[in-house]
Amino acid sequence: MSTAARKIRLLMLLRRNGVSDTGVLRAIEMIPREVFVPPTFHDQAYEDTALPIGHGQTISQPLVVGLMTQVLDLHDRLRVLEIGTGSGYQAAVLSRIVRRVYTIERHRPLLMEAERRFNTLRLHNITARLGDGMRGWPEAAPFERILVTAGGGAEPPADLVKQLAVGGVMVIPLGPDRREQRVVRLRRTESGLAREDLWPVRFVPLLPDVAPEAPRAERAS
């Protein structure tokens, strides 16, 4: 089966399973997922499955990407903060819908690979940086939308809530542990947060700080 046929099959699966927003479907169609997975998994790029990308991280299942993007309720004037760049695929999808994407990754090698992909695909409205996602990006705040692509514990990080604009939406997996996570949509109001629990998921945990880098191999003397 050709890559084009695999992509069409995946888009049909997404439609059958609740991804109905034409802007989201168009963005997923535009972004070549095979660019964001290791070469070993190129033949699985358009399967509806999460795939390993190294450093204990995964590229999310396309259905999860589609549904989480859809519930953000996006339009082309928005600035979006993404926590957890990973392969860069989710940020790339967002970039085809909104004005600007800010994305934070704690693993330097993943960030460098993602930035290379953004440049290759000429996705110039994405700004990425290495950092602690739990602290957000205060100098660029407030954001109209925040998407967290890692399990955020029982409550959303306080710094991210502060950086969400009034009227803005945050979509984040929350739960006491990985076995009990749910995607939650939070809308910031003048008086606090309105919470809507959506569907169960399993994401890698949201961790503080920048990940330590593996030590360089010593040169042979």
Curated annotation (Swiss-Prot):
GO cellular component, one term: cytoplasm
Positions annotated as active site in the UniProt record: 60
Gene Ontology BP annotations: methylation; protein modification process; protein repair
Enzyme class, UniProt record, top EC level: transferase
Catalytic activity entry: [protein]-L-isoaspartate + S-adenosyl-L-methionine = [protein]-L-isoaspartate alpha-methyl ester + S-adenosyl-L-homocysteine
Protein's UniProt keywords contain Signal: no
Subcellular location: Cytoplasm
Enzyme Commission (EC) number: 2.1.1.77
PROSITE patterns xref list: PCMT
Pfam families referenced in this protein's UniProt entry, alphabetically: PCMT
CDD domains to which the protein is assigned, alphabetical: AdoMet_MTases
Principal subcellular localization: cytoplasm
The family this protein is said to belong to: Belongs to the methyltransferase superfamily. L-isoaspartyl/D-aspartyl protein methyltransferase family.
Protein role: Catalyzes the methyl esterification of L-isoaspartyl residues in peptides and proteins that result from spontaneous decomposition of normal L-aspartyl and L-asparaginyl residues. It plays a role in the repair and/or degradation of damaged proteins.
Protein name per UniProt: Protein-L-isoaspartate O-methyltransferase
Organism: Rhodospirillum centenum (strain ATCC 51521 / SW)
Gene symbol of the encoding locus: pcm
